[in-house]
UniProtKB/Swiss-Prot annotation:
Pathway assigned in UniProt: Amino-acid biosynthesis; L-tryptophan biosynthesis; L-tryptophan from chorismate: step 5/5
Record-level GO cellular component terms: cytosol
NCBIfam families xrefs: trpA
Entry protein name: Tryptophan synthase alpha chain
EC number assigned by the record: 4.2.1.20
Job description of the protein: The alpha subunit is responsible for the aldol cleavage of indoleglycerol phosphate to indole and glyceraldehyde 3-phosphate.
SUPFAM superfamilies, alphabetized: Ribulose-phoshate binding barrel
Native organism: Rhodopseudomonas palustris (strain BisB5)
Family membership: Belongs to the TrpA family.
Catalytic reactions of this protein: (1S,2R)-1-C-(indol-3-yl)glycerol 3-phosphate + L-serine = D-glyceraldehyde 3-phosphate + L-tryptophan + H2O
Binding partners and assembly: Tetramer of two alpha and two beta chains.
Amino acid sequence: MTTRIDTRFAELKKQGRSAFVTFVMAGDPDLATSLQVLKALPAAGADIIEIGMPFTDPMADGPAIQAAGLRALHSGATLSHTLGLVRDFRKDDDTTPMVLMGYYNPIYIYGVDAFLADAKAAGVDGLIIVDLPPEEDSELCLPAMKAGLNFIRLATPTTDEKRLPAVLANTSGFVYYVSITGITGSASADSAAVGDAVARIKRHTDLPVCVGFGIRTPEAARAIAAEADGAVVGSALIDALQKSLDADNRATKATVGAVADLVASLAAGVRGAKQAAE
């Protein structure tokens, strides 16, 4: 099974560059604007798109992404709406990989089998579920793989050599390395430490390793992209979106452009990095 994610990384490897992975929250600040933002991302330079599934208790997320989730929930966004956004995006773009990221509870309530069928039909390529450890693989990971979706696992600075094989066992698509301990948007990533961590993970897997948390500038994106197969940016994009909203947290004429302009700037940073020697 070759997914859009596999195809995209193969293309990027031929080009000798790393992936630029963007994260935005579904339904932030409303569904119509959210779709416009999603459609603007590939043209601005996003290689892979992660879409946050709004949830009431996002324990791993920092203030920016928590606020984005609340704006989305207040606008009425549900998991069904999130899948609808992917479906609408796919009407114009059948190549950019789309990964849903979030927590298990909304999927459990939706129903695992129904969710996987609907996600696949909508055009979702992979899942990142931050609160399902490998010990729970039978809940969602294995059924997702059977449905043809990549299940992307998080590794962290505290994932030691003993734990890493379990983390990687049923991972596919790519490995998401969380470069700092703590919540999203909280600190800056250290590219030297990231390089060591990526090398350690790659001793255990042939999968691409993407690095997220703590990347906010083109310079930081370039430094991380030189060490990894991809750089993931979320909080900085959500900050840019939030700053473009009016006093009532409604979208303005500047909202889509504010996100797209930052994506273009960060993408230029990623493209300026030389892929680390294999």
